[in-house]
């Protein structure tokens, strides 16, 4: 998937190719998941809750990020699209997440990313849980403004930044 990401960034592959590769990767990871011993690499890399914030029904990019993170060895809990803010916090508590990934594809849903971070603070979890944001309207400046730990422009970058933050 890393090579697919690189080729996509260079304009050598297009979104349908990336989606097919992600589907194949997901099928492969799922087929092998049961064969992996308990306490294997995925538990060592970190636990990530990933979803698209409330009001946004787009999930192609988020799904590709989830697949690539999982294939890189992270335990990923993809909680879907149009996810209420509180659900991110509840799932993070349930699985003892190290990081929450917040996707938004519409400018009108960007505030949901900020709201999750604020709720993490209210719940006393902000120092324990890293936050990565992404999506077409998201930027590094937005990440800085809302206090996210990082911004990833694409799935390959999301894997790199997750590895850096959770090392």
UniProtKB/Swiss-Prot annotation:
Keywords: Cobalt, Metal-binding, Methanogenesis, Repeat. It holds the Pfam family B12-binding. GO terms for biological process: homocysteine metabolic process; methanogenesis; tetrahydrofolate metabolic process. Residues 1-44 form the B12-binding N-terminal domain. Residues 45-167 form the B12-binding domain. The keyword Metal-binding applies. Methylcob(III)alamin binds at residue 58. The keyword Transmembrane helix does not apply. One of its GO terms (molecular function) is cobalamin binding. SUPFAM superfamilies: Cobalamin (vitamin B12)-binding domain. One of its GO terms (cellular component) is cytosol. Pathway: One-carbon metabolism; methanogenesis from dimethylamine. InterPro entries: Cbl-bd_cap, Cobalamin-bd, Cobalamin-bd_sf, Corrinoid_p, Met_Synthase/Corrinoid, Meth_synthase_dom. CDD domains: corrinoid_protein_B12-BD. Acts as a methyl group carrier between MtbB and MtbA. PANTHER family: METHIONINE SYNTHASE. Belongs to the methylamine corrinoid protein family. This is Dimethylamine corrinoid protein 3. It comes from Methanosarcina mazei (strain ATCC BAA-159 / DSM 3647 / Goe1 / Go1 / JCM 11833 / OCM 88).
